[in-house]
């Protein structure tokens, strides 16, 4: 059976009733049932749930149930974090405010309790109890009162802060509230001095920040890449740093500084100068507390630079005070050790160099600072000139002047100035470090002046240290600063630099120095000798070095002239390589970016799926825990009710008194009932035994009492009977007298009323008459009104029923019309679907047919290409063999590139003249290639329209060149023909190249062809788009090498240049008969106007054009004989050539 649940508003009323009767636990259970019931979670708005939530949290605070408050807050967040964030914020702030108020009230109560105890007895302030308690626990009354009264509320408030932070850490809408609660938690730790809770709070916030940086941006997730989030985190860490410094938790302060630096590095926006100044100030304080004087001075120097550069209203006094602070902190840095490698023998997690590098990163420095570098930076910034005269003298005495006898006296005056000046309170911590640096300077300067010195004399010079401190500094200087010092306690003397053979490293003095140590002089003797000898050689031979430099310069110039062209080409080539490399890298970057984008998208998808799975698992886990908690709560409730029920009985109280709280919690209701029954049985047995033991006593005692009572009872009854008789007689007499008096009064009253009978009868008659007429009149009016209302209602019912019948008829007509329209629409939709399906099947059949035709044509094309390649290879081999035979005969009458023979030496025919120059052939070949490319483009367009022709215009250049080099061009004419040619013929003596490509006739023919091509352009592009799209959708193949499909079958031709393929886009051109007729007419016109070439023995027409028709006359016999001889000499080369 399902559990009965109340509506939220009813639950709130019920909870208020429980509170009024003093049952807050029942009220809290009632409200908790509402939040546990998912039926009401999302059915009501925040206006209904928010008052209930406030009451729920109020009860949790009153009863100190922080875990129950956490459960309710999480449920409320899930309901309203995406709907109304302000409501969630108000609820959380109200909860924390109530917890803080109760904690403050507990603190005031604790203080008041201690005050009452203290003022209880002024004569006995120290009571024996207080003395014993202080001896046992070591606490005073305030501590004990706080532990009993204040500490539970402090713990509750701390748990409340932690729960709210955990609640809001992943909600981007509540970022400001999250950081406000973090600051409130810091204030809580400061107010109640909770250092351990402060450390846990810092760890919790650091863990939350790491989770934000790792997690992806969800729907309500917090993204660290947003500027607002970064600024809020930065402000919170700065507040954390201030709180840690106030509580003197320097380790937490250092971790906060690391977090702040990481956030500033992560932010794309530069932090404001005020934030940076606060950061450097706190960092310098942390370094000072850690005893790291070097980085403390570096942080102060960064703060001084930032303030000097960015603060506009900086006064001279402030600048002087900051400069003095920086200068004194820098001078107080201990002198660096000459043995930094000693630290690597110390077992630690990180080496000192790594630690120093990490600290330098916090200051924004590229490398760790040193004392020398900081002093150099201080001098560069002109800090010594900004301070007062005393501090300027301090710098000069420590870092510039060499005066060991007066050094300590001078420094002592500065120390006195710092200690006596109230404005120098910030500089007091540097006094001891300054004294140590001064003593070390003194020892170093004394070692450069004296070889030995008395201990007492050195103590006089070091005025502000005793003998033990001085000896310790001497030992430390030997250990860390690589100084040769020997103390002779017998003679009470100190010896410096006695071992002249020991000097492990180069000595670089830090600060003022008079001379180097003797061991250093001996170690660098060879270096000094080399320097002196080099200087002497330059003085003895002053021109040698100049001549060497001039010779070296000439060699460099000559070498430059030798390699400049090569280097120039190399640089240009390198530039080209760089450009290619850039293009390659750009392509790689683009590909990588695309791959990265795909990978990120995939990772984002996987992360979303994982997050969704995690949320589902968490939801299941929460449901499981909630179910377990409900079962446990039911058990506890039943146990509590059972215990309460048992405690109401005497034997139950007795049984419970034998058990403690832990024992009761371990038992369940059945075990308690069992113990109760056992207790009842035991008590019953005890009672039965007692009764049996007392039965005899009671029996005899009762019998004795009754025997003694008999005479007394008889006397009492006799006296009582006499008294009762007297009382009855007196009472009866009084009753009779009263009855007689009442009778007399009633008779007198009746006599007085008899005279009013006639008046009564008259009044009744008049009243009856008057009311009868009024009744009749009202009855008539009522019947008339009733009849009128009946008629009106009948008329209204007739009209209403008539209107209802009309509306029903219209509704039926409308439904019939809609039904018919729906049937027509469904029929039309079915017809359209059938037509679409038919069109789709038709398109698929057409595509399949075209695909099969394409595959068939493609096989034909591959076969034709293979045959063309074989013919080309065969012809190239034949041409090569023919070329070898002709080179043996050495055609002397027609040398290539030389002077052409005159007409008198040989009147060869027009087609036997030498081939054009290579450049002319190449030009014409290039022209063919260009026109071939145009044909390829047009052919590609026809292929997209579904054509199946293939145009190989790209091969025209190769075939033309092969034809130009073929054997017929270099064969000799027979001597008989040369002799038979008349020398006085009308043929021109110079060469006529009109038959060649590019002549006048061919030019007209090409112009006409080009004009036709231009006319065909628009017709080719007229219907190209849709078919191209359809072919692209079908995945139509398009060749990229220039060849394309044609509608005509492939001709098997030879490898000669005359076999170049023709244009395949003829479907849009003029018919072939009309084009041939135009060409013949053009030729006829040209023959009529051209000079007669037949007399010279040449061919009359241009052989490159279309062949002669049937109507033309046969060629002359001499031409036929010449043709036979050429064919015989070509070795069958022209037999396979088909006429166009």
Swiss-Prot record:
It is found in: Cytoplasm. The modification Phosphoserine is found at residue 908. The keyword Lipid metabolism does not apply. Its main location: cytoplasm. Residues 588-630, 829-1140 are annotated as: Disordered. Residues 319-501 form the PCI domain. GO terms for biological process: formation of cytoplasmic translation initiation complex; regulation of translational initiation; translation reinitiation; translational initiation. GO terms for cellular component: cytosol; eukaryotic 43S preinitiation complex; eukaryotic 48S preinitiation complex; eukaryotic translation initiation factor 3 complex; eukaryotic translation initiation factor 3 complex, eIF3e; eukaryotic translation initiation factor 3 complex, eIF3m; multi-eIF complex. The keyword Cytoplasm applies. Keywords: Cytoplasm, Initiation factor, Phosphoprotein, Protein biosynthesis, RNA-binding. Pfam families: eIF3a_PCI_TPR-like, PCI. Residues 588-623, 829-899, 920-976, 990-1051, 1059-1086, 1109-1130 have a biased composition (Basic and acidic residues). GO terms for molecular function: mRNA binding; translation initiation factor activity. Belongs to the eIF-3 subunit A family. PANTHER family: EUKARYOTIC TRANSLATION INITIATION FACTOR 3 SUBUNIT A, EUKARYOTIC TRANSLATION INITIATION FACTOR 3, THETA SUBUNIT. RNA-binding component of the eukaryotic translation initiation factor 3 (eIF-3) complex, which is involved in protein synthesis of a specialized repertoire of mRNAs and, together with other initiation factors, stimulates binding of mRNA and methionyl-tRNAi to the 40S ribosome. The eIF-3 complex specifically targets and initiates translation of a subset of mRNAs involved in cell proliferation. Component of the eukaryotic translation initiation factor 3 (eIF-3) complex. The eIF-3 complex interacts with pix. This is Eukaryotic translation initiation factor 3 subunit A. It comes from Drosophila melanogaster (Fruit fly). The lineage of its organism: Eukaryota, Metazoa, Ecdysozoa, Arthropoda, Hexapoda. The gene is eIF3a.
